[in-house]
Amino acid sequence: MTGSPATLAKLGSIMQISYVPEDYDAALDYWTQKMGAGPFFHTEKVEVENVKYRGEPSDIQFSMAIGYWGDIQVELIRPNNGAPSMFKDWRKNGLQGVQHLCLIIDDLDHARALTAEAGGEVIQEVSLPGGVGGAFYADYGGGPGTIIEYLQIPQAGLDGFAAMRQMHLDWDGKTNPVIGKE
């Protein structure tokens, strides 16, 4: 098997569009009030372990909000410290729009091998607390907005995403547009 584009595409379907907006709160307002996405679930301090950015350990701290827009998960990320990360670099470079897309996969090692075969570069990687999963972000050289996140999470995480999506389907578009944010 080779890491051809067709092989990479078979790893999974895009389930998330992620942004690292200049103004996190304005982005939440845009997605909830203009686009009808939500409700969003805000986490002030995302817990990740064993973070590496471009192969070096990093103590990134960031906030995240996740909501659904139909079947697509929308993720907003706000870097909260100056530690090296692709999120910090995105903001430092003044980039706007989609930062990365995410696929849920079953085997990180397999995805990593296919990424290497296709000439992709793993630019950031994280483990979830307790070793229950993880993610890596690969750059295939397509420019801003073309980074792919490969995420492996346990069934409980998938169930959580399904519950968020169901809340979106049942949501009135007004009540509690952002859950967990003061």
Where do the model's predicted regions map?
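Residue-level detector of flexible, active-site-proximal loop/helix-junction positions
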Residues: 46-47, 129, 157
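Conserved catalytic-core motifs of GNAT/GCN5-like acyltransferases
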Residues: 41-45, 126-127
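Glyoxalase I/VOC metalloenzyme domain signal
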Residues: 1-15, 19-41, 54-121, 132, ...
